[in-house]
């Protein structure tokens, strides 16, 4: 990977996306992020003045189109795409999932990835080399009780990834999915609180259940995910394609608190 690369990271102003963006920026790459949250964008740009940004809701096609108009105006090219935008969705049994929450989760986690990829792929193809990393989840590798919108969207991400890898391989573009386990931070805290409420347990009890899923008995760090993404976009990782790579401390199995 050379410093001439232009990299787009969706939901790049906070969390995993910010870690990824700052890792690429450290090498002197050109980084453009998009995010729905203007406050997060301003904070990111204040700390990373060499980066550029667009305020974008990836679930809205017209906003994604505007995002790529920005990229074309600023850089005129794109080498690497990191599809990171996603939300956790509702925590409830499938019969209690609000239809609008299902639609919102699929809209951001899957439709948004499709919209962004649709615009990005022609730009990357022109270079006859490049990388795409789609952020899925260990929830895309197994079922997860009370998380049907999220799990369904993340399974779909892996299917999209494998298909893109087949289509783009002849252009020397590798495409992979990175599947984080529970990542320490605000999102898992919100999920834990929702599960605790639904199950009549304390947040500490639910947190312990989640941590017991992993052989390492801890949550992974956002930096762990960023390091894997960076490797897959480097020369050393370029022959890896079409894979769904878990970064999860080895998930041994699902939590069983629904049986309590």
PLM features per residue range, with description:
Residues 56-66, 99:
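The beta1-alpha1 cofactor-binding region of Rossmann-like NAD(H)/NADP(H)-dependent oxidoreductases
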Residues 169, 174, 240-242:
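Short, small/polar-rich loop/turn modules that mediate ligand/substrate recognition or access, typified
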Residues 2-32:
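Canonical Rossmann dinucleotide-binding motif of NAD(H)/NADP(H)-dependent dehydrogenases/reductases
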């Amino acid at each position: 990977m050379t410093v001439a690369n232009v990299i787009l990271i969706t939901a790049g102003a906070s969390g995993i996306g910010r870690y990824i963006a700052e890792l690429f920026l450290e090498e002197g790459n050109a980084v453009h992020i998009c995010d729905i949250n203007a406050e997060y964008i301003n904070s990111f740009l204040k700390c990373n003045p060499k980066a550029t940004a667009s305020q974008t809701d990836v679930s809205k096609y017209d906003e994604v189109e505007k995002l790529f108009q920005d990229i074309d105006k600023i850089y005129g090219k794109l080498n690497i795409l990191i599809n990171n935008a996603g939300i956790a969705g509702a925590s409830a049994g499938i019969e209690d999932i609000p239809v609008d929450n299902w639609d919102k989760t699929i809209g951001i986690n899957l439709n948004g990835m499709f919209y962004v990829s649709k615009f990005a792929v022609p730009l990357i193809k022109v270079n006859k080399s490049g990388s795409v990393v789609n952020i899925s989840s260990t929830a895309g590798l197994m079922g997860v009780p009370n998380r049907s919108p999220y799990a369904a969207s993340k399974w779909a991400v892996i299917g999209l990834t494998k298909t893109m890898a087949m289509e783009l391989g002849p252009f020397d573009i590798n495409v992979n999915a990175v599947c984080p386990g529970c990542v320490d931070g605000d999102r898992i805290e919100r999920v834990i609180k929702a599960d605790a409420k639904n199950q009549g347990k304390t947040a500490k009890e639910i947190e312990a259940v989640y941590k017991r899923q992993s052989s390492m008995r801890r949550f992974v760090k956002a930096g762990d995910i960023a390091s894997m993404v960076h490797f897959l976009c480097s020369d050393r990782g370029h022959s890896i394609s079409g894979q769904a790579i878990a970064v999860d401390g080895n998930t041994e199995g699902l939590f069983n608190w629904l049986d309590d």
